[in-house]
Curated annotation (Swiss-Prot):
The keyword Phosphoprotein appears for this protein: yes
Enzyme nomenclature, EC number: 3.4.23.-, 2.7.7.49, 2.7.7.7, 3.1.26.4
Organism phylogeny: Viruses, Riboviria, Pararnavirae, Artverviricota, Revtraviricetes
Integrase catalytic domain span: 1442-1600
Catalytic residues (positions): 564 (protease)
Record-given protein name: Gag-Pol polyprotein
Occurrences of domain RNase H type-1 (ranges): 1172-1318
UniProt motif LYPX(n)L motif: location: 128-132
Length: 1733
């Protein structure tokens, strides 16, 4: 089955030298690449039967040659040498071609489908297929193909195909049957036959037809059928890739099988069913049916032809006939085409881009893989010369980085071929360094880098030491010298020694260490100066200070201080932690310098607690213990013979401990010995269970974890943060330990996250913490199943009072990571001493990963499942790595602990022996103290809360509330206590700590000190919940019966939401019960709950009042509280406010429904029924409506016939607010009377009866906590409800049409409110502004014009006050009005209408003279408004000038068409203004050269030279080239106004028509080639009737549009054209009957008068900016008009004509308002004045 298939194309490529020789004999030259392209891709598209593998059939070659030599644009002259050479190969075949050429091939049809009939010819195909052609009567001698020896029929080791003879037709075979029988010779069977197809008969030696397997000639001369063997199908299936993996390889296999075996239709189905899946087979069959061609050689979709050529069901083809075999041959060809089409992958350039060169891959192998990717994932042929550039670029960019960089730097890269690039890449590849050389180079670079860094560090250290000693040596010289003299017993400084002088005996010639007089005995013990002295060294690399010195612990680290009574402040030399912002100057012998203080949050313990802050002086040689700390310690310095001793006031040695505030609670923990100490027995019996004896754990039953990533995740690489030397040295031992244990391993990963060194509090030890936040974002989220500590202890019954607590050490490291997930957690680490410089990653589950707790918790639960089953009497609680084992007796606890330790050891987990609490009755677990079935708060946690200082910032307050909130279960009413504190925690709120906050702060601390013990929930007993409510806070206690007593389980408290807090007390109790029941469910775990409260709320829940509760809230409460299986209500009890437990004495219960009914309304006697003996019966109404764009509102109180009160309300008042005002006014006017008031407003009615009381109790807040609308009006209404003696507010329908009293009164009130809204002044006394005497200047200056105007208006003069009065107001003079309004407008820049409305709404105390005229003048003369405001001027339409005959006047324009296929992005459109005829040309550029070219080459030859051309001011038209061409040709080129498309309206409208038509055509045809569809769009434009009912075609040619039926079979009748004389007569008629009337009509339009614009020469105008930026005025100017036309004008300063629609008039102040210059008394000053208009 491994035979290679030989085709004519492959045969020519194998003998390419002979092919070139034959081509040279034909005087042509051929190239191998183009030879393959033409044969496999080009010639099969000619539809003449040329196969992709080539053929030597002369008939097909002749047809291809005729297509190649076709004259005109359809020919292919570049293919002539190749088809001529191929024809020469067929006519004069060389020896290697002769076996594949028929002696005399008959002419072949153009289509592969054979017509029926005995004389039908077979379809053309490759010569390797059996040539089923009729034999020639004069049969030539049989060629000697095979040797006479009995060799195999087909040699499987050679590539040459077997010879095939000619196949005779059916009729010829019948006529020559006898001759063939007599002349046939039978050859001996081949030994290879059995190897090929099993038991097959040898073929007839003299047979004239070839054998088409599996059809064989039997002994009686009949064809027999031989199916595929199962071994063949099995080998083909298993030894080849699937169709989806490599479609090309499987297609080649099936093609070879179709050629060599000649299967029938059934065999083909069997072959496809074996090698392909169902979906692949369906796709192949569908593609094969698409390849069926009709009689015209084109693909067909006719069902009959498709089913005939490629049937889906078994056909009745007779394989013994020529017609049946031809059908079968065609079926195989179509099947092969379907395989090829179905195997084509969709274009995916990303796959090609993903092919990169491997580290050790040669460039040649990489290029082959790249080409294969091009063939598989793109439709491009990588061997095509046109694709060589793309392949070359991909080869460069996707090569190895070192090769790619060097290839990019090649000189003259554009001229390099792909072969040149491969050769250069091979040179670079061969010169690469070996892996050993690369490792050696990297090692040398690392060593050099480390050596440089080490030298730099040493140099920097030496410089720092030198500078420090130089600056501070003189500072302490006196102290050091004096102390040395004290030790030596003298007061003089010892003399200077020579270089060779002994310091002991003062003799020369030796040193002190070699002095013979120096005693050699053992050194005596040093005197102890402190109990906490751990050594003499004061710091790393520092000599101990001289005596007297004392060693103290600072932050857990021993520091040796020099006692310096001359130092005012104590000094630390090394970084003690965080430094404060305070600093101080230190004056020394060498000068002064500023140093910082440490923070004062340090607690020191010696004789007492003190707080101290050190001075941080890193340049000081030794730490100093100054007078400040000596004073606080009450230290005593005694001078003895051995030196100075520093002790406390009682004579004891001093000891000082410094630690952080968060670890302070550990000081208060009592170190109590456990009842059963963890001795050597537990350690020795279970060595594998303890981390101290068993080493690092490993969960043996857990498979390595695979961490799934999100679908869109990509690797993240974050560089390592800079790390100090101290931190690096601190975490180095931990990294080394983890590397030795195999938990960390070196790696190379695209992922990288930084490592953070975290300093352990109280020590100098660091631990490594990895920042995995970015990795956590890219990992899939899993649901967290870690238990909730809040209710975890609910599963611990009080009967189990013996406990064992185990803490698993390094728990996460017990779980392994899968190798595929390990690169996610890589980080950088460099350690030159260990030879590590790169990345490390975790092989175990790391800490800091978001899913680590859940994964470990689930794994440990699975591993401990068997232990729980085997020990059902024990309780095992697990919170991640903290285990709690509880038992009823000590023996059961010890037995269970042993079993648990054995299980943990076997499973591979390790517990910490230091933290273990084994078999005790009192243990600490999760921050609680468990003892005797109860849980307590630990004293350490209480002390932590008590020791916190008073908060000074919101953050400190949040920390306090968080710490105290952990203990809220022990504090009754915690929510109510902390209520004053929570508002200060919000961001943006002023932190104002007052007495209320201090009181709450102290109450919480006091409650915490008196916190009781809480019993553990017993899930076998029912729970009781006592609930109380006070001022919107729900409080409760959850209890369980313990004998005759109730033992508290938890104290619950919560604040109610704003809606529930505004309810009556009984309903607030319902809300409180619902809130606390939900919280208690977390502890009761669904057990029965009995609710006891001082209210009978069960009846309220069953029948809640609909006026207070919404439906959603009512349903929620009923579903929670009426679940009788879980919740039951107990009797009504009175609770103790302190303990929330029932009181001994019982109070009389109250009726909640009755109390609730009483609280529904604000006024008890308020009713909605008329009062019979009422004093007044009034009707109220309020209205709000829009009038002239302004909302007007009014309100009224009326009877049936008269208006009691009415008034206008401020503009913008809503109808609801107006109704409230009207009702409130009626109540005020009926004070002390009996009143019936009718209103048609449901809003006002419900507010008075129901909602008002609800709003008041709620604090006038909505359910979201926001202030309600109309708050002031609602408050006024609630206050006015109590004014009448008796009151009835009745609701009546609005807009009634009846004649009842209600209808008449409602209509009267509605009409009165509407009339009141139209008034200008509000008359209601409740909303009147108190009248006040307006401020009057000392005097008003009235001009003569003002006085004349005042007399005309009838004003009176007030002699007392000295001003004129009109309408009861002082009159402001015209000049003062101008100054006031001008200032107001400059502040607001409002329009005249808005300024009038503003002045009308804000009632002025003055009467402004000529106000409206002054407002108009001020706004019109404002320069800023003129430059910004839009213009409302409307310019009349002009008249467009048209030509008097076709071709004389054209409009031209460019329009852009996207997408720009083939480089065509623009369309140049010409429109004849006379006829509307359009010419459009696609162009690639928008230039003047293109315009001139189309004008001279297209417009001029067809229509003559235009007289006028119109266009916009585009660069292609306004350029010097276009204008010069127009001048030379005598064309009057008119450039239209800029930014005025209406000026070129005809061509602009045609642009839109053409683009709309192209859009429709592209949608209908499915193509994006608009250039191809442009003729159809032009046809539509030219044959569309215009405004006069004629199409441009009719105007131009004088004939109707050529609308014909293109599908009419009698279309030939329309081809008879009339004579030339008839055409001329028709044109003459058109000129007389069409052109002249059109020209006259156009002239009439020009003669009609056009309304000109109002601008004249000399006017000042503003010109519009067509392109404005941010904060830039819309208009520029003003400019002076120089010239005008009916539609345009030219201004001074702008060269182009401007359309009249783009300008607006500029108002200039009259001469009287110009600025005037006046002299003043000061000669250096002048006065500028301007009068009013």
């Amino acid at each position: 089955m491994g035979q290679t298939v030989t085709t004519p194309l492959s045969l020519t490529l194998q003998h390419w030298g002979d092919v070139q020789r034959i081509a040279s004999n034909q005087s042509v030259d051929v190239k191998k690449r183009r030879w393959v392209t033409f044969c496999s891709a080009e010639w099969p598209t000619f539809n003449v039967g040329w196969p992709q593998d080539g053929t030597f059939n002369l008939g097909i070659i002749s047809q291809v040659k005729s297509r190649v030599f076709c004259p005109g644009p359809h020919g292919h002259p570049d293919q002539v040498p190749y088809i001529v050479t191929w024809e020469a190969l067929a006519y004069d075949p060389p020896p290697w071609v002769k076996p594949f050429v028929s002696p005399k091939p008959p002419p072949l049809p153009t289509a592969p489908v054979l017509p029926p009939g005995p004389s039908a010819q077979p379809p053309s195909r490759s010569a390797l297929y059996p040539a089923l052609t009729p034999s020639i009567k004069s049969k030539p001698p049989k060629p000697q193909v095979l040797p006479d020896s009995g060799g195999p029929l087909i040699d499987l080791l050679t590539e040459d195909p077997p010879p095939y003879g000619a196949q005779p037709s059916s009729s010829a075979r019948e006529n020559n049957e006898e001759e063939a029988a007599t002349t046939s010779e039978v050859s001996p069977p081949s030994p290879m036959v059995s190897r090929l197809r099993g038991r097959r008969d040898p073929p007839a030696a003299d047979s004239t037809t070839s054998q088409a397997f599996p059809l064989r000639m039997g002994g009686d001369g009949q064809l027999q059928y031989w199916p595929f063997s199962s071994s063949d199908l099995y080998n083909w299936k298993n030894n080849n890739p699937s169709f989806s993996e490599d479609p090309g390889k499987l297609t080649a296999l099936i093609e070879s099988v179709l050629i060599t075996h000649q299967p029938t239709w059934d065999d083909c189905q069997q072959l496809l069913g074996t090698l392909l899946t169902g979906e692949e087979k369906q796709r192949v069959l569908l593609e094969a049916r698409k390849a069926v061609r009709g009689n015209d050689g084109r693909p067909t979709q006719l069902p009959n032809e498709v089913n005939a050529a490629f049937p889906l069901e078994r056909p009745d083809w007779g394989y013994t006939t020529t017609e049946g075999r031809n059908h079968l041959v065609l079926y195989r060809q179509l099947l092969l085409a379907g395989l090829q089409n179905a195997g084509r992958s969709p274009t995916n350039l990303a796959k090609v881009k993903g092919i990169t060169q491997g580290p050790n891959e040669s460039p040649s192998a990489f290029l082959e893989r790249l080409k294969e990717a091009y063939r598989r994932y793109t439709p491009y042929d990588p061997e095509d010369p046109g694709q060589e550039t793309n392949v070359s670029m991909s080869f460069i960019w996707q090569s190895a980085p070192d090769i790619g960089r060097k290839l990019e730097r090649l000189e003259d890269l554009k001229s390099k071929t792909l072969g040149d690039l491969v050769r250069e890449a091979e040179k670079i590849f061969n010169k690469r360094e070996t892996p050993e050389e690369r490792e050696e180079r990297i090692r040398r670079e690392i060593e050099e880098k480390e050596e440089r860094r080490r030298a730099e560090d040493e140099q920097r250290e030496r410089e720092r030491d030198r500078r420090r000693h130089r600056e501070m040596s003189k500072l302490l010289a006196t102290v050091v010298i004096g102390q040395r003299q004290d030790r030596q017993g003298g007061e003089r400084r010892r003399p200077q020694l020579d270089k060779d002088q002994c310091a002991y005996c003062k003799e020369k010639g030796h040193w002190a260490k070699d002095c013979p007089k120096k005693p050699r005995g053992p050194r005596g013990p040093r005197p102890q100066t402190s109990l906490l002295t751990l050594g003499d060294x004061g710091g790393q690399g520092q000599e101990p200070p001289p005596e007297p010195r004392i060693t103290l612990k600072v932050g857990g680290q021993p520091v040796t201080f020099l006692v310096d009574t001359g130092a005012q402040h104590s000094v630390l030399t090394q970084n003690p932690g965080p430094l404060s912002d305070k600093s101080a100057w230190v004056q020394g012998a060498t000068g002064g310098k500023r140093y910082r203080w440490t923070t004062d949050r340090k607690v020191h313990l010696a004789t007492g607690k003190v707080t101290h802050s050190f001075l941080h002086v890193p340049d000081c040689p030794y730490p100093l213990l100054g007078r400040d700390l000596l004073t606080k310690l009450k230290a005593q310095i005694h001078f003895e013979g051995s030196g100075a001793q520093v002790v406390g006031p009682m004579g004891q040695p001093l000891q000082v401990l410094t630690l952080n505030i968060e670890d302070e609670y550990r000081l208060h923990e009592t170190s109590k010995e456990p009842d059963v100490p963890l001795g050597s027995t537990w350690l020795s019996d279970f060595p594998q269970a303890w981390a101290e004896t068993g080493g690092m754990g490993l969960a043996v039953r857990q498979a390595p974890l695979i961490i799934p990533l999100k679908a869109t995740s990509t690797p993240v690489s974050i560089k390592q943060y800079p790390m100090s030397q101290e931190a690096r040295l601190g975490i180095k031992p931990h990294i080394q330990r983890l590397l030795d244990q195999g938990i960390l391993v070196p790696c190379q990963s695209p992922w990288n996250t930084p490592l953070l060194p975290v300093k352990k509090p109280g020590t100098n030890d660091y631990r490594p913490v990895q920042d995995l936040r970015e990795v956590n974002k890219r990992v899939e989220d899993i649901h967290p199943t870690v238990p909730n500590p809040y209710n975890l202890l609910s599963g611990l019954p009080p009967s189990h009072q013996w406990y064992t607590v185990l803490d698993l050490k390094d728990a996460f490291f017990c779980l392994r990571l899968h190798p595929t997930s390990q690169p996610l957690f890589a980080f950088e680490w460099r350690d030159p001493e260990m030879g590590i410089s790169g990345q490390l990653t975790w092989t175990r589950l790391p800490q800091g990963f978001k899913n680590s707790p859940t994964l470990f918790d689930e794994a440990l639960h699975r591993d401990l499942a068997d232990f729980r089953i085997q020990h059902p009497d024990l309780i095992l609680l697990q919170y991640v790595d903290d285990l709690l084992l509880a038992a009823t007796s000590e023996q059961d606890c010890q037995r269970g602990t042993r079993a648990l330790l054995q299980t943990l050891g076997n499973l591979g987990y390790r517990a910490s022996a230091k933290k273990a609490q084994i078999c005790q009755k009192q243990v600490k677990y999760l921050g609680y103290l468990l003892k005797e079935g109860q849980r307590w708060l630990t004293e350490a946690r209480k002390e932590t809360v008590m020791g916190q200082p008073t908060p000074k910032t919101p953050r400190q307050l949040r920390e306090f509330l968080g710490t105290a909130g952990f203990c809220r279960l022990w504090i009754p009413g915690f929510a109510e206590m902390a209520a004053p504190l929570y508002p200060l925690t919000k961001t943006g709120t002023l932190f104002n700590w007052g007495p209320d906050q201090q009181k709450a702060y102290q109450e919480i601390k006091q409650a915490l000190l008196t916190a009781p013990a809480l019993g553990l929930p017993d899930l076998t007993k029912p729970f009781e919940l006592f609930v109380d409510e006070k001022q919107g806070y729900a409080k409760g206690v959850l209890t369980q019966k313990l004998g005759p007593w109730r033992r508290p389980v938890a104290y619950l408290s919560k604040k109610l939401d704003p809606v529930a807090a505004g309810w009556p007390p009984c309903l607030r109790m319902v809300a409180a019960i619902a809130v606390l029941t939900k919280d208690a469910g977390k502890l009761t775990m669904g057990q029965p709950l009995v609710i006891l409260a001082p209210h009978a709320v069960e009846a309220l829940v069953k029948q809640p009042p609909d006026r207070w509760l919404s439906n959603a809230r009512m349903t929620h409460y009923q579903a929670m509280l009426l679940d009788t299986d879980r919740v039951q209500f107990g009797p009504v009890v009175a609770l103790n406010p302190a303990t929330l437990l029932p009181l001994p004495e019982k109070e009389a219960p109250h009726d909640c429904l009755e109390i609730l009914a009483e609280t529904h309304g604000t006024r008890p006697d308020l009713t909605d029924q008329p009062i019979p003996d009422a004093d007044y019966t009034w009707y109220t109404d309020g209205g709000s409506f829009l009038q002239e764009g302004q909302r007007r509102a009014g309100a009224a109180v009326t009877t049936e016939t008269e208006v009691i009160w009415g008034g206008v309300l401020p503009a913008g008042t809503s109808a609801q607010r107006a109704e409230l005002i009207a009702l409130t006014q009626a109540l005020k006017m009926a004070e002390g009377k009996k009143l019936n008031v009718y209103t048609d407003s449901r809003y006002a009615f419900a507010t008075a009866h129901v909602h008002g009381e609800i709003y008041r109790r709620r604090g006038l807040l909505t359910s979201e906590g926001r202030e309600i609308k109309n708050k002031n009006e609602i408050l006024a209404l609630l206050k006015a409800l109590f004014l009448p003696k008796r009151l009835s507010i009745i609701h009546c329908p609005g807009h009634q049409k009846g004649n009842s009293a209600e209808a008449r009164g409602n209509r009267m009130a509605d009409q009165a409110a509407r009339e009141a809204a139209m008034k200008a002044v509000l008359e209601t006394s409740t909303l009147l502004i108190e009248d006040s005497t307006p401020y009057t200047p000392p005097h008003f200056h009235y001009t003569e014009t003002d006085l004349k105007r005042l007399r005309e208006l009838g004003a009176t003069y007030n002699q007392t006050k000295g001003y004129w009065v009109l309408q009861g107001k002082p009159v402001m003079p015209d000049q003062s009005v101008f100054e006031l309004l001008d200032s107001l407008h400059r502040l607001t820049h409002l329009s005249p209408q808005k300024m009038k409305a503003l002045l009308d709404r804000e009632e002025s105390p003055y009467y402004m003279l000529n106000r409206d005229r002054t407002i108009q003048y001020v706004t019109e003369t404002c320069t800023a408004c003129a430059q910004v405001n839009a213009s409302k001027a409307k310019i009349g339409a002009g008249v467009r000038v048209r030509g008097h005959r076709p071709g004389t006047h054209w409009e031209v324009d460019f329009t852009e068409v996207k997408p720009g296929l083939y480089g065509y992005k623009y369309l140049l459109v010409f429109v004849d203004t006379f006829s509307g005829w359009v010419e459009a040309f696609p162009t690639k550029r928008e230039t003047a050269k293109v315009v001139s070219k189309k004008l001279l080459e297209d417009i001029f030859p067809r229509f003559g030279m235009p007289q006028v051309l119109g266009s916009d001011n585009g660069p292609a038209f306004a350029s010097q080239v276009s204008q010069s061409v127009a001048d030379l040709l005598g064309i009057d080129w008119k450039l239209h106004c800029a930014y005025r498309p209406q000026s070129s309206g005809q061509v602009e409208r045609m642009n839109r028509t053409i683009k709309e038509t192209l859009t429709k055509l592209t949608l209908a045809s499915g193509t994006r080639d608009w250039v191809l569809l442009l003729p159809l769009a032009l046809y539509r434009a030219r044959n569309t009737p215009g405004p006069h009912g004629l199409t441009p075609y009719e105007i131009l040619y004088g004939a109707p549009p050529p609308l014909v039926n293109f599908h009419d079979p009698e279309m030939s009748k329309l081809t008879n054209s009339p004579s030339l004389q008839a055409h001329l007569q028709a044109l003459q008629a058109v000129q007389q009957e069409v052109w002249k009337p059109l020209a006259a009509a156009y002239q009439d339009q020009l003669d009609q008068p056009v309304i000109p614009h109002p601008f004249r020469v000399g006017d000042a105008v503003w010109v519009r900016r067509h392109q404005t930026k941010n904060l830039e005025p819309r208009w520029k100017g003003p400019y002076t008009v120089l010239l005008t036309t009916p539609t345009a004008l030219k201004v001074d300063g702008i060269s182009a004509w401007i359309h009249a629609a783009h300008v607006k008039a500029a108002t200039t102040p009259p001469a009287g308002t110009a600025w005037k210059v006046q002299r003043s008394q000061n000669p250096l000053k002048i006065r500028l004045t301007r009068g009013a208009p």
